């Protein structure tokens, strides 16, 4: 069954080297019970590790069931260990966070097979007399009971080979004999047992005793009454490993990952806290940015689309500005001439502004008075939500009618309907015909603190102005803004006899550019806020990586155990990645809840415009998962790269 020829193994310790095995050759038949003895440093444990496929020889041949295994890959050896061998260790190597039955089931996770593993585990526990303690943790059991659990674990895959490394080394005489009784029974059932011990009385339970010294076999004797009851191979050495991402396999890894996470609650919480804060910051910051953007979009709608603003320039005498309109003064005829430009212009409205004192009964309010034309309502999204807009006749007749902004309406009328009420504007009676839609603030200015009246009424009855303060022009399309600007510029220069190089007499402002600038600014602020929050996510990810590296160091023996019972490199890496992603995802989910809560509080108590978007939730969640993958990769690779024998020896 087992044949090794001229096997050598040398360990390097600093600059010196120690030859643990020096040309060892031996054959072990199927169904034998072999004890390997020797003093400390004799090479017996090294031989056991090579026979158990936990280590590979430097030179020589190792044939197991007729197949050369000494040059197989790590994953191939893992498959054979899982399918053919069972291990019993001196230190038991039970996982303290798992119950007895879960410890026994552990090798089945890496088998790639399906079945009622817990039922099989209970049978194995019953064989060793511990079925009634299947739900206990290792720390609730004696040393002898823990070793019996380890034997049950070694038997769960029904292996042909049992490797027992000092199985009684940490037990008293009574428990030692109990363990040896179990091993003897297994031998009678046909198992091939290879045991390392330094105790002569324990070695006497075996049918064959191999003694080693200084890396060579010095004695190999069999009992006269040795009996072989070989177990027939059940499927040979073919590993039953399945695809790494098989659903049942992944589920087992996920369950174990969260068991590991839950076993260190405080440390896990502190690790997750960084991700939690990062995700909550991303959600809250992006909610602020999205809310600001939505608020800005509402304000931009109130400004109208494809809009040009034509204003008189300011003359300069001795470098001093003389004020707007001192050079070029626009009249209603200028507005009409602009309206007549063919194929480019949709709407035009003259505009005059001033201040006014409004009075209704015992209430008064100082506000801005804006005289506008018929088309202004459509151009600037000012059509009343309550009441109506001016008619052309009212503008021609200089009618004393007014449309109130929502702030003015609230100050004068509260919740009452102001339509058809009579108010005074600068001591002149006006009839309220409507309330304009709310526009909000544009910077520090309240756009709803205004009263609209016909431009003719404002000029000749209220403000006493002979000229327009400006002209608003709505261009037919965004593509026509440039040609419309050129046409208006040429028209004004012609009408007012201005030189081609005169840049001070008037200006044409493209409100679309202003809108784009505001949108770009808002977008930049949103990105800046999101970037700042993302930094905290990265810092949280570094914290996760640090904890995972510590976890790899602390769990080195566990990693060695998992590899000994059949875990491949990919299995180890995947489990640690799942743990890392599990922590970041948990932090991400809690962070989403906290972030949304903070956003709601900012909106409710600070009055800030916030809007939580699904995009920010998906982004934060996805980013937290990526953080877990990225920062968990190094610890996972480090864990996967550990050699089984080195990991099991780790102190």
Swiss-Prot record:
GO terms for biological process: response to antibiotic. Coiled coil: none annotated. Non-canonical ABC transporter that contains transmembrane domains (TMD), which form a pore in the inner membrane, and an ATP-binding domain (NBD), which is responsible for energy generation. Confers resistance against macrolides. The keyword Secreted does not apply. Homodimer. Keywords: Antibiotic resistance, ATP-binding, Cell inner membrane, Cell membrane, Membrane, Nucleotide-binding, Translocase, Transmembrane, Transmembrane helix, Transport. ATP binds at residues 38-45. Pfam families: ABC_tran, FtsX, MacB_PCD. It is a multi-pass membrane protein. One of its GO terms (molecular function) is transmembrane transporter activity. It is found in: Cell inner membrane. GO terms for cellular component: plasma membrane. PANTHER family: ABC TRANSPORTER PERMEASE YTRF, MEMBRANE COMPONENT OF TRANSPORTER-RELATED. The chain crosses the membrane at residues 269-289, 532-552, 589-609, 614-634. The keyword Translocase applies. Residues 2-239 form the ABC transporter domain. This is Macrolide export ATP-binding/permease protein MacB. Its main location: membrane. Belongs to the ABC transporter superfamily. Macrolide exporter (TC 3.A.1.122) family. InterPro entries: AAA+_ATPase, ABC3_permease_C, ABC_transporter-like_ATP-bd, ABC_transporter-like_CS, MacB-like_ATP-bd, MacB_PCD, Macrolide_Exporter_MacB, P-loop_NTPase. Its EC number is 7.6.2.-. It is an enzyme of class 7 (translocase).
């Amino acid at each position: 069954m087992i044949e090794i020829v001229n096997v050598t193994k040398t360990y390097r310790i600093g600059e010196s080297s120690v030859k643990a095995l020096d040309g060892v050759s031996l054959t072990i038949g199927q169904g034998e019970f072999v004890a390997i003895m020797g003093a400390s440093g004799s090479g017996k444990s090294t031989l056991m590790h090579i026979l158990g496929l936990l280590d590979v020889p430097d030179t020589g041949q190792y044939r197991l069931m007729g197949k050369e295994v000494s040059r197989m890959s790590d994953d191939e050896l893992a498959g054979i260990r899982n399918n053919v061998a069972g291990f019993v260790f001196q230190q038991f190597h039970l996982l303290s966070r798992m119950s007895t039955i879960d410890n026994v089931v552990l090798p089945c996770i890496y088998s790639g097979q399906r079945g009622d593993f817990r039922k099989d585990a209970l049978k194995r526990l019953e064989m060793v007399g511990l079925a009634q303690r299947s739900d206990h943790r290792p720390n609730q059991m004696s040393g002898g009971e823990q070793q019996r659990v380890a034997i049950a674990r070694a038997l769960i895959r029904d292996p042909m080979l049992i490797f027992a490394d000092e199985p009684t080394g940490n037990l008293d005489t009574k428990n030692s004999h109990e363990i040896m009784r179990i091993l003897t029974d297994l031998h009678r059932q046909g198992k091939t047992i290879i045991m390392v011990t330094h105790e002569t009385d324990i070695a006497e339970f075996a049918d064959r005793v191999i003694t080693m010294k200084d890396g060579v076999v010095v004695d190999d004797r069999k009992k006269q009454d040795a009996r072989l009851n070989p177990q027939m191979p059940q499927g040979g050495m073919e590993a039953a490993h399945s695809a790494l991402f098989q659903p049942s396999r992944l589920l087992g890894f996920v369950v174990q990952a969260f068991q590991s996470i839950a076993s260190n609650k405080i440390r896990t919480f502190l690790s997750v806290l960084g991700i939690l804060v990062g995700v909550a910051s991303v959600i809250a910051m992006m909610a602020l940015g999205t809310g600001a953007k939505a608020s800005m979009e509402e304000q931009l709608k109130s400004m109208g689309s494809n809009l040009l603003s034509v204003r008189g320039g300011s003359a300069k005498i001795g470098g001093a500005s003389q004020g707007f309109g001192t050079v070029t003064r626009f009249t209603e005829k200028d507005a009409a001439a602009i309206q007549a430009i063919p194929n480019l212009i949709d709407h035009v409205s003259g505009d005059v502004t001033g201040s006014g004192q409004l009075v209704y009964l015992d209430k008064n309010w100082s506000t801005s008075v804006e005289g506008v034309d018929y088309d202004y309502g459509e151009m600037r999204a000012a059509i009343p939500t309550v009441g109506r807009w001016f008619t052309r006749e009212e503008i021609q007749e200089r009618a004393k009618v007014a449309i109130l902004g929502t702030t003015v309406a609230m100050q004068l009328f509260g919740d009452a309907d102001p339509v058809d009420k009579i108010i005074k504007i600068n001591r002149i009676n006006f009839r309220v015909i409507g309330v304009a839609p709310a526009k909000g603030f544009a910077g520090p200015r309240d756009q709803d603190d205004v009263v609209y009246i016909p431009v003719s009424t404002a000029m000749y009855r209220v403000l006493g102005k002979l000229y327009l303060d400006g002209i608003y022009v709505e261009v037919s399309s965004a593509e026509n803004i440039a040609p419309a600007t050129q046409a208006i510029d040429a028209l004004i220069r012609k009408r007012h006899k201005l030189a081609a190089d005169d840049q001070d007499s008037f200006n044409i402002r493209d409100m679309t550019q202003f809108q784009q600038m505001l949108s770009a600014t808002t977008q930049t602020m949103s990105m800046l806020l999101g970037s700042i929050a993302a930094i905290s996510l990265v810092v949280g990810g570094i914290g996760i990586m640090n904890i995972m590296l510590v976890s790899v160091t602390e769990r080195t023996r566990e990693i060695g155990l998992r590899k000994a019972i059949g875990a491949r490199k990919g299995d180890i890496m995947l489990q640690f990645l799942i743990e890392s992603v599990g922590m970041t995802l948990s932090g991400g989910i809690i962070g989403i809840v906290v972030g949304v809560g903070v956003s709601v509080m900012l909106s409710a108590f600070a009055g800030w415009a916030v809007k939580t978007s699904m995009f920010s939730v998906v982004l934060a969640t996805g980013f937290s998962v990526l953080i877990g993958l990225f920062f968990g990769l190094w610890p996972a690779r480090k864990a996967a790269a550990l050699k089984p024998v080195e990991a099991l020896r780790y102190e």
